[in-house]
């Protein structure tokens, strides 16, 4: 029996500079630009200013990726239980343009809000993204992978989640098969995962399985290493709504959670929940990590990610501390300005580059 690998191919708009030498990828966390459900909570200028401070960084990358937390649809009722604080997100389809304008090339749909408005919401979201030329993946049986072309180089992306309608990272055997098939098609592979417990107390990456609200949310260290061992070159996560540490494992880059990036409504932005980094990662033509940088932005209610005076490196400091605590044997170092480098080991010495 042959298994069908569902793949969406997008020919992206901006060029890849010196691909034979390197590729720079901009990674971000959760995106929920506003919602019309149950009552409208939309940003000033109908979304025009959401990405004003981050647009240049995202556009300058060869590839910009993030997690679309919710749906892009203009009507419909949620299947979720009616509660006063109902986390069901319905962003107008017109806001897909702001994703494109911000510089995004790919978004994950493998999260616990993609089905907030049922299959109709999924179809509407897919259509809105296609209209803007933005690739997507993460829904089992519909959009399991995407391939983005850059000057003849095929970059494969897959998005994993823990919900029944996603490509589940709880089934490592299935993940391995997906990566094997993607590796046969592509030169570089990027994996996005949605997992981990949620909340301000969940900044550290534990060993073993994480749970939240009775759900199994993944053994994320094991998952990330498994993906690298089976062909992935870059792995990035989201789901806890706070940032977590990074590591370089076998020469490949892993970010365990990039937190809330552009979530001006409906999600707490207090304290560390408002930390909104962009992490840029430069890899060589074989996918090996070369260098990176953590750009520190802070969110405030209704505004999106912003630079803040006196806090230029605040998020980088947090991610540096978490990385050094949780991944002391990583091959990466982070300085106080957010630069990420690679530790080189020799027989007689240890050097950083």
Give residue spans per PLM region.
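Acidic, metal/ion-coordinating pockets
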Residues: 19-353
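Sec-dependent signal peptide recognition
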Residues: 1-10, 14
């Amino acid at each position: 029996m042959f298994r069908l690998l569902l793949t969406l191919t997008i020919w992206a708009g901006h060029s890849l500079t010196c691909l034979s030498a390197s590729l720079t990828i901009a990674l971000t966390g959760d995106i929920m630009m506003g919602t019309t459900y149950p009552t409208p909570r939309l940003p000033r200028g109908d979304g025009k200013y959401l990405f004003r401070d981050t647009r240049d960084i995202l556009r300058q990358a060869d590839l910009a990726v993030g997690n679309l937390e919710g749906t892009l649809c203009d009507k419909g009722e949620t299947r979720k239980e009616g509660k006063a604080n109902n986390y069901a997100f319905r962003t107008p389809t017109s806001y897909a343009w702001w994703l494109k304008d911000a510089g995004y090339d790919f978004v994950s749909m493998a999260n616990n809000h993609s089905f907030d408005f049922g299959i109709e919401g999924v179809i509407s979201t897919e259509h809105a993204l296609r209209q803007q030329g933005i690739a997507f993946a993460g829904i089992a049986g519909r959009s399991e992978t995407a391939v983005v072309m850059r000057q003849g180089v095929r970059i494969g992306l897959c998005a994993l989640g823990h919900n029944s309608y996603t490509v589940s990272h709880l089934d490592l055997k299935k993940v391995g098969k997906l990566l094997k098939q993607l590796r046969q098609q592509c030169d570089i592979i990027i994996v996005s995962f949605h997992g981990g417990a949620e909340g301000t107390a969940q900044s550290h990456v534990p060993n073993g399985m994480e749970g939240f609200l009775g759900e199994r949310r993944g053994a994320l260290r094991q998952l990330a290493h498994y993906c690298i061992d089976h062909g992935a070159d870059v792995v990035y996560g989201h789901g806890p709504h706070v940032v977590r540490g990074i590591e370089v494992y076998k020469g490949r880059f892993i970010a365990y959670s990039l937190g809330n990036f552009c979530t001006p409504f409906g999600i707490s932005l207090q304290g560390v929940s408002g930390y909104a980094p962009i992490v840029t990662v430069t890899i060589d033509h074989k996918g090996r990590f070369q260098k990176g940088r953590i750009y520190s932005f802070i969110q405030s209610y209704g505004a999106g990610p912003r630079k803040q005076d006196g806090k230029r490196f605040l998020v980088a400091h947090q991610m540096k501390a978490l990385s050094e605590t949780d991944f002391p044997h990583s091959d990466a170092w982070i300085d106080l300005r957010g630069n990420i480098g690679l530790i080189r080991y020799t027989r007689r010495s240890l050097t950083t580059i």
